[in-house]
Design a protein with these regions (language model features):
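Conserved beta-alpha junction segments in alpha/beta enzyme cores
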Residues: 1-97, 101-212
Length: 212
């Protein structure tokens, strides 16, 4: 009988999802060709996912992954999130990452002078507070889990640094000569009763853009 080896890890884990949808009229001029600065409505809500990992039988350090549905934040804005969460405990190792959606507003500090920009700082402050509370909740919900994972391949990624040889310069365009990293890692997190808590997908390495 054939046997398939499955990669697994045992750890403590918790997952909390937090709604971080900004005000519908916040600054949104992410694209240079945008015809307006402030958003005019909300198509879908956006979220922050708080993932907590802790070694079995060792509470000396917890790894906190904060996954934000935003394109990016300034480094100082990321540090303020980390500092806020770090106030919970000195035993936290915190990582902030982004889905890189281009549809969630642009929260850079130099945007506050534009229409809708006055809502950026209050939104970020509220988001930091809510992330801290969600992290506390996740830490209180830590439980023993099994993470089953496997590597695969995702062919969506392409290289977009194309060398225009006529002009002797790089342009933003499809480059068929370079094969990007297409490694895909997927995981399933299950509790002691084999109930699935969440699924994890990592390194789907393509730049997510809407069709415009």
């Amino acid at each position: 009988m054939d046997k398939v080896e499955t990669q697994t890890s045992r750890t403590q884990f918790a997952f909390v999802r937090l709604d971080i949808t900004p005000p519908e009229d916040i600054y949104h001029g992410l694209w240079g060709a945008a015809a307006q600065h402030a958003a005019t409505g909300i198509h879908k809500n956006i979220f922050a996912d708080i993932l907590v990992f802790q070694k079995l039988g060792d509470s000396s350090q917890s790894v906190i992954m904060i996954l934000l549905d935003h394109v990016m934040f300034e480094e100082s804005q990321q540090e303020m999130i980390k500092e806020k969460v770090q106030n919970i405990s000195d035993n936290l190792k915190i990582l902030v990452t982004f889905s890189h959606t281009h549809s969630a507003g642009f929260m850079y500090s130099d945007r506050v002078k534009f229409p809708g920009g006055e809502k950026i700082n209050p939104y970020l402050e509220l988001t930091r507070d809510n992330i801290k509370e969600a992290t506390k909740k996740a830490l209180d919900q830590l439980e023993d889990v099994t993470i089953t994972f496997e590597y695969g391949q995702c062919g969506l990624a392409t290289n977009r640094d194309y060398k225009d040889r006529k002009r002797d310069q790089f342009v933003c365009g499809f480059n068929p000569e370079v094969i990007p990293d297409q490694t895909l890692l997927v995981g399933r997190v299950s509790d002691a009763n084999d109930r699935i808590l969440c699924n994890l997908v990592h390194n789907c390495s393509f730049h997510k853009l809407p069709l415009v």
